[in-house]
Design a protein with these regions (language model features):
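Thiol-based oxidoreductase modules, predominantly thioredoxin-like and allied folds used
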Residues: 73-76, 100-115
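Structural alpha/beta surface segment adjacent to cysteine/selenocysteine redox centers
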Residues: 114-127, 133
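Structural recognition of the beta-strand scaffold that forms the well-ordered cores
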Residues: 71-73, 104-105, 132, 141
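N-terminal targeting signals for export/organelle localization
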Residues: 1-57
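Local sequence-structure signature of Cys/Sec-based thiol-disulfide redox active-site neighborhoods
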Residues: 62-95
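Extracytoplasmic
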Residues: 66, 98-100, 127
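Sequence context surrounding c-type heme c attachment/ligation sites in exported
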Residues: 90, 94, 98-104, 121-122, ...
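Non-catalytic, surface beta->alpha helical segment in thiol-disulfide oxidoreductase systems
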Residues: 126, 131-151
């Protein structure tokens, strides 16, 4: 499971391909914040990031318990839920001073596949899917959107 974090690091980062359905670019495969801050993705990323109001009490709880956490985040730049939730996730991660080297961001195509198959065996059927690991063991998931709050 967690071996996906490190085995795929030699692949192309922030690979953009043409999406026939939307007639624009979409990211596929391993990505990072820098990819989301490039056009055309920066339009929705920056808007949602800036507009999200943090729950400061919840952020403090997360900050106190995030030391041994790592995250796999599957998303689609073509997906409305991903466009809404992923910038908010980054806002929370920034607020808790999360080390982004412990975040693996994988962009999927419309069929929920990535070029290197990082999703294989992880039961990814919807995006975004955020998987939390503590000491290399999965401890939770948020799929599409949270029930109450991302924090």
């Amino acid at each position: 499971m967690v071996s996906h974090f490190f085995t795929s690091c030699s692949t192309t980062m922030n690979q953009a391909v043409y999406d026939k359905q939307s007639k624009t670019k979409m990211l596929v495969g391993l990505s990072n914040r820098g990819g989301l801050q490039q056009d055309p993705f920066s339009v929705w990323f920056n808007k949602e990031y800036g507009a999200y109001a943090l729950n400061k009490e919840a952020v403090q709880v997360i900050k106190n318990d995030s030391e041994n956490l790592s995250i796999m985040l599957f998303m689609g730049t073509w997906c409305g839920d991903s466009r809404r939730e992923v910038p908010r996730i980054y806002r929370i991660l920034d607020a808790v001073d999360f080390d982004e080297s412990r975040l693996t961001l994988i962009n999927m195509d419309r069929e929920k596949n990535s070029p290197n198959g990082e999703e294989t065996g992880l039961n990814i059927h919807h995006v975004p899917t955020l998987i939390l690991y503590k000491n290399s063991s999965e401890i939770g998931r948020v799929i599409e959107s949270p029930i109450q709050s991302l924090e």
